A protein has these predicted regions:
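Conserved PLP-enzyme active-site core in the AAT-like
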Residues: 8-9, 13, 18-21, 29-30, ...
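Long amphipathic N-terminal alpha/beta scaffold segment
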Residues: 33-51, 63
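N-terminal amphipathic/basic leader segments beginning at the initiator methionine
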Residues: 1-9
């Protein structure tokens, strides 16, 4: 707890965060110093390349939906390697009929189940080797499934396995309920 608190505090200090960064803006938000600076803080704390922090994202499912629709195009394949994602994504993916789902736009969905509370590394490696996957989704939290959350050690191992086969595939981690429970985040891997 103290380690992560200090990491956040240092990022606030490095970016000189003050009350002026939390003032409202008008118009389209061009030159919104508060938004831009807070996004730098989030990226630094999470050791990410960049971040998108908006009050307009009303839930984690909303943020995931925006990311999926940004990355995936008709003919692309999304692969979940931690089993089925949260039920809230069923309509987004197209597991439940929805005229606005990824499936309705021509995006295919596949999943690989966990094996004894761990990734099925061999199946993942074989599937990724076909070189037709656009995005791999990992749900760290157990969600509604009867399994343990995925440790960062297992996640690091599977990401290295994937990168050894395909360095360009997009790997998206749903880290819901996993923030700040370890010294580092999935974006640090």
């Amino acid at each position: 707890c103290e380690y992560n608190s200090l990491k956040v505090l240092k990022a606030f200090q490095k970016n000189n965060i003050s009350d002026m960064h939390f003032n409202g803006t008008t118009g389209y938000g061009y030159g919104d110093i508060g938004r831009d600076t807070i996004e730098r803080v989030f990226a630094e704390v999470l050791e990410a390349e960049d971040s998108l922090v908006r009050t307009q994202f009303i839930s984690g499912t909303h943020a995931l939906t925006v990311a999926l629709f940004a990355y995936l195009r008709p003919g692309d394949i999304m692969l979940s390697i931690s089993g089925k994602p949260y039920d809230t994504l069923d309509e987004v993916i197209g597991l439940v009929e929805n005229d606005s789902s990824l499936k309705s736009y021509g995006v295919q969905y596949e999943q690989i189940e966990l094996k004894d509370d761990d990734f099925d590394y061999e199946e993942i490696k074989n599937r990724v080797a076909k070189n037709d996957i656009k995005l791999i989704e990992i749900q760290r939290s157990r969600g509604y499934a009867l399994r343990s959350s995925i440790s960062l050690e297992k996640m690091e191992k599977v990401i290295k396995t994937i990168r050894a086969v395909n360095k360009d595939v997009i790997i998206m981690v749903d880290n819901c309920y996993g923030e700040f429970v370890d010294k580092y985040e999935p974006t640090s891997i």
